[in-house]
């Protein structure tokens, strides 16, 4: 959250650079990107600039023309732009060269964005690159959009400086081109850290099948060494890029496994590999992820249920420990083992943050000037705390851009070498780019904060997209919104536009995340409750969080059960209300088996009541909702047909008792 550069509307679709060169040069979509063409005294294709911006000769990268910004008014916010022609379903890379001089303020600096609206002019989203501030020579700022949504009708590109920033900036060589990703982005496995001793492992390739690639009649092949050491090759359909093999059939020890995308004529169109290790027995670890995506902490399944913190002190820990939560993620991680000891004594685990230890980034400590400084700091920190029983995981990255992908990947790898006993958790708002971030984390979370600009259903949309992006290879600890955006606004007028989630919204968003695959929740945030914006009472908000958390905490034994693993407990779901978009369907379901009983979680993330009818795998004699409900009891319309009526935003966890045989 803390690295967010814009408000919610701007954040929803902000993405960084994918660091993958497009195959072949694509058509330039910006007209007069260097600002050099002038006609009738006006800069061709660009709108007229307002005060504090100007087009000037001789100040560009090569002594050519450039767009200049000079501002001493913290209230000024305007920027030039031009329309660009983008296509739905495509991604676009965009860039600008910027230079800054004493550019200061809370914003991200001099940057570039693309925004889109629908046919009626309603803002739908955009892509926003991380900017440059301070005093820096010419720097290329760039990013890649998400897939352009079908509803988007008009697009504009803007070189700009964020509101409230003072100083000087220069812009040159604006560019927008269609982004064509590489056919093969990576190869991943369902084994935690690509290490296994038994059972099966599935390998999944991240492929991008453009029409041009499909036209080549491509297929996939996986090459590995079997238990005898012989090389084996297994084929797969390019539309289903996965292979499941017995771990016992793999060569003992470490090997390089390769996936290739091969055209009909034998040409290799793309390839990726991973280092996989078969062992006789899994190593002892304090905290790790099992084959079911569950956290195993000191040998026992664990469902992280916590909140973000700012500073840890014993008084706050005493207060927090009275609630239902079992962990915390403090931005200001404990510097002493005494504080970690105190958390442990109170039954609380700590997700330890090292997310700021990247030189040159906004929140980097003053002493972190080089990557060598980073490694030294991280090494000392890990050595100090890796054996502490309160340590749950390391927090590696809070919304860093994809321009840092090599550094983020190297950080995860470093943490594994220094502490193989704990996973690395990353949280992103770039929820539709999770697949590209896969090498950078062991556990992923995304943080949909929709209230009050967007519906609570956003929690389902983001979690579904996040789960899809992991290729089923990494677990989710999601970050639901418990705070009021007003806590981050400055003026009373700005604060008045926002409110906190209601208890019903918070409850729904948490259960939506779980229903869509989350095996942990860390609410944002505990410390924001005490800012009390718009006259809120902290204890009232805290009580709401506790009630929601307590309801989830009571069901953790069910949520961690794997008795029904591999079974399709819910075969089909029908709703009374038609759903236009699969991505935004209001109903989410997930099921478990615990002590012979089946539990079906069904959540209505929408704003209208829903009747839900589910076809079940087995036959049952009794159905009971174990959560508090205002919509009556669930109904068995037949041994294998369950009907549940749900109020707006309502979850139900239905316990189904099997027919006795």
Predicted regions located by residue number:
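Active-site groove signature of glycoside hydrolases
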Residues: 377-407, 428-450, 520-522
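Extracellular and organelle-lumenal recognition/adhesion modules and their flexible linkers in secreted
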Residues: 24-244
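Catalytic domains of carbohydrate-active enzymes, especially glycoside hydrolases
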Residues: 307-342, 346-351, 444
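C-terminal beta-strand-rich structural cap/linker in extracellular carbohydrate-active enzymes
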Residues: 637-661
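Aromatic/acidic polysaccharide-binding cleft in carbohydrate-active enzymes
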Residues: 492-550
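Active-site clefts of carbohydrate-active enzymes
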Residues: 358-362, 467-504, 528-531
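Carbohydrate-binding surface patches
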Residues: 577-620, 649
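N-terminal carbohydrate-binding accessory modules
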Residues: 267-321
């Amino acid at each position: 959250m803390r690295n967010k550069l814009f408000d919610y509307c701007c954040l929803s679709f902000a993405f960084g650079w994918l660091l993958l060169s497009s195959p072949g040069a694509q058509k330039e979509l910006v007209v007069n990107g260097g600002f050099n063409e002038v006609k009738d005294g006006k800069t061709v294709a660009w709108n007229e600039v307002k005060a504090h911006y100007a087009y000037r000769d001789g100040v560009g990268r090569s002594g050519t023309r450039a767009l200049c910004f000079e501002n001493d008014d913290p209230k000024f916010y305007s920027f030039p732009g031009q329309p660009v022609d983008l296509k739905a379903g495509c991604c676009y890379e965009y860039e600008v060269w910027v230079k800054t001089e004493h550019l200061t303020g809370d914003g991200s600096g001099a940057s570039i964005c693309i925004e889109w609206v629908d046919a009626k002019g309603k803002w739908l989203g955009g892509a926003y690159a991380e900017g440059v501030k301070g005093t820096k020579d010419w720097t290329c700022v760039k990013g890649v959009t998400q897939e352009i949504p079908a509803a988007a009708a008009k697009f504009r590109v803007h070189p700009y400086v964020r509101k409230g920033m003072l100083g000087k900036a220069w812009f040159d060589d604006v560019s927008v081109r269609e982004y064509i990703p590489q056919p093969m982005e990576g190869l991943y496995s369902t084994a935690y850290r690509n290490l296994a001793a038994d059972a099966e492992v599935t390998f999944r390739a991240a492929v991008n099948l453009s029409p041009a690639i499909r036209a080549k009649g491509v297929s996939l092949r996986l090459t590995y060494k079997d238990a005898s050491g012989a090389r084996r090759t297994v084929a797969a359909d390019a539309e289903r890029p996965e292979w499941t093999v017995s771990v016992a059939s793999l060569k003992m020890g470490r090997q390089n496994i390769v996936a290739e995308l091969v055209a009909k004529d034998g040409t290799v169109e793309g390839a990726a590999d991973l280092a996989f290790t078969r062992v006789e027995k899994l190593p002892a670890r304090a905290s790790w992820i099992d084959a079911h995506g569950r956290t195993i902490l000191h040998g026992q399944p664990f469902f992280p249920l916590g909140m973000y913190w700012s500073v840890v002190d014993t008084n706050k820990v005493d207060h927090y420990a009275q609630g239902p939560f079992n962990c915390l993620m403090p931005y200001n991680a404990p510097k002493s083992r005494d504080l970690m000891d105190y958390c442990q004594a109170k039954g609380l685990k700590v997700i330890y943050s090292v997310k700021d230890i990247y030189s040159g980034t906004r929140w980097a400590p003053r002493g972190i000037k080089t990557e060598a400084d980073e490694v030294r700091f991280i090494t000392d920190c890990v050595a100090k705390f890796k054996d502490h029983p309160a340590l749950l995981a390391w927090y590696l990255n809070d919304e860093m851009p994809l321009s840092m992908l090599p550094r983020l990947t190297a950080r995860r790898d470093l943490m594994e070498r220094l502490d193989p006993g704990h996973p690395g958790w990353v949280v992103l708002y770039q929820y539709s780019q999770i697949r590209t971030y896969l090498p950078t984390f062991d556990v992923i979370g995304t943080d949909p904060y929709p209230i009050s600009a967007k519906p609570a259903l956003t929690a389902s949309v983001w979690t579904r997209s996040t789960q899809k992006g992991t290729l089923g290879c990494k677990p989710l600890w999601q970050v639901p919104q418990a705070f009021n955006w007003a806590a981050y606004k400055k003026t009373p007028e700005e604060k008045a536009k926002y409110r906190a989630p209601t208890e019903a919204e918070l409850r729904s968003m948490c259960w939506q995340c779980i229903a869509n695959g989350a095996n942990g929740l860390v609410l944002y945030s505990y410390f924001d409750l005490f800012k009390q914006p718009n006259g809120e009472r902290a204890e009232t908000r805290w009580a709401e969080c506790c009630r929601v958390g307590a309801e989830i905490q009571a069901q953790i034994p069910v949520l961690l059960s794997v008795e029904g693993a591999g079974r399709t407990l819910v075969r089909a779901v029908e709703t009374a209300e038609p759903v236009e978009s699969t991505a935004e369907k209001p109903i989410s379901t997930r099921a478990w088996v615990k002590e012979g009983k089946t539990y079906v979680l069904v959540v209505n993330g929408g704003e209208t009541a829903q009747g839900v009818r589910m076809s079940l795998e087995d036959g049952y004699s009794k159905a009971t909702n174990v959560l508090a409900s205002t919509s009556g009891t669930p109904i068995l319309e037949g041994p294998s047909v369950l009907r549940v009526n749900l109020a707006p935003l309502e979850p139900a966890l239905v316990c189904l008792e099997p027919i006795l045989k």
